[in-house]
């Protein structure tokens, strides 16, 4: 969320005191801030990165604990939303390992992108890695799964749309080629649509020494 969005959500004034509060949380490692491209101007986005706080706010805060509560929540929509958010955060915090898995020697810029092309078609990309040396932009799609990730017909079309929209946007460096990287828990399942992905990265890659 942006500073203005956070201020609105909390009911606090988005002034100097609020800015100082965000800076203290950033310096302590509780949140991170990063640029979000795609809008008319670059926005600074703040994200909670403390894993315990993410769990506490989702499952403990304002919830009366009772026997069997966690078992009842397992594999519910609430559980999968939390798992998806924390897996995406895990990937963001392991950028050097992702870079190694993709065999990228240097990353000149990394960011999330949410924008439109000149025709007004929109798309959101979890993470873009720009590599000037290889003249390549890696469009990273991050997906939590409990087995090898299988690409459906709809998801295949969604990935191709993201590639097309980003390619036609002002963010894309026209001298760079584009490649799609899927970062998932257990890797990519080979099927009729798996060829849309150029690179597959798994949890094993994130924790490789």
Regions from the language model: what does each represent?
Residues 171-209:
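Domain-level recognition of nuclease-like catalytic cores that cleave nucleotide substrates
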Residues 95, 123-146, 159, 180:
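Conserved catalytic cores of phosphodiester-cleaving nucleases, focusing on short active-site segments
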Residues 1-125:
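Accessory nucleic acid-recognition modules appended to NTPase machines
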Residues 40, 55, 136, 189, ...:
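Flexible, glycine-rich phosphate/dinucleotide-binding loops
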Residues 58-60, 139, 151, 192-195:
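Short conserved micro-motifs at the rims of enzyme active sites and ligand-binding pockets
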Residues 145-165:
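Mg2+/Mn2+-dependent nuclease catalytic core
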Residues 133, 141-142, 161-162, 168, ...:
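Long, low-complexity, charge-rich intrinsically disordered regions
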Residues 93, 97, 103, 161-172:
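Acidic, metal/cofactor-coordinating or nucleic-acid-engaging core segments within structured domains
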């Amino acid at each position: 969320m942006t500073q203005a969005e956070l201020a609105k959500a909390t009911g606090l004034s988005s002034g100097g005191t609020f800015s100082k509060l965000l800076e203290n949380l950033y310096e302590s490692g509780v949140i991170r801030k990063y640029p979000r491209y795609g809008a008319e101007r670059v926005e600074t986005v703040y994200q909670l990165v403390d894993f315990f706080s993410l769990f506490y706010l989702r499952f403990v805060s304002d919830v009366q604990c009772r026997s069997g509560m966690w078992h009842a929540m397992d594999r519910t929509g609430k559980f999968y939303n939390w798992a998806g958010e924390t897996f995406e955060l895990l990937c963001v915090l392991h950028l050097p390992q992702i870079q190694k898995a993709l065999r990228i020697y240097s990353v000149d810029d990394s960011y999330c992108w949410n924008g439109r092309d000149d025709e007004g078609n929109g798309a959101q990309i979890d993470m873009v890695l720009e590599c000037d040396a290889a003249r390549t932009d890696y469009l990273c799609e991050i997906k939590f799964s409990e087995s090898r990730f299988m690409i459906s017909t709809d998801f295949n079309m969604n990935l191709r749309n993201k590639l097309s929209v980003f390619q036609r946007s002002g963010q894309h460096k026209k001298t760079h080629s584009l490649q799609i990287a899927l970062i998932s828990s257990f890797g990519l399942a080979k099927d009729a649509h798996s060829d849309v992905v150029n690179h597959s990265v798994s949890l094993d890659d994130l924790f490789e020494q």
